[in-house]
Amino acid sequence: MIKENTLKIFLSNGITLTVKENEKIFIKGQEESFAELYELIATCISNKNNVEFSVEIDHEYEDENKKKKHQVVKHEYFIPSEKITWFMIEEV
């Protein structure tokens, strides 16, 4: 079994965000790296700005006829700045 890298972001308001290596991160409509997301969160906390980003997940599955299918699911995140005082990232 191949291990897939997963990064977890723990926020001070109790929310945990999980982003897997194969998921695409979008900030203001542009695809970005996990490092860019980290920088966005750090900057927003210090500047007291809201954090907005989305994650697209390409799910691959088999239908009832055993044909491979793809479904892209988009998750939008909006985190008010006053809700976050610190964050921590862990690779699992």
Please tell me what each predicted stretch does.
Residues 1-92:
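Eukaryotic intrinsically disordered, low-complexity regulatory linkers and tails enriched in Ser/Thr/Pro
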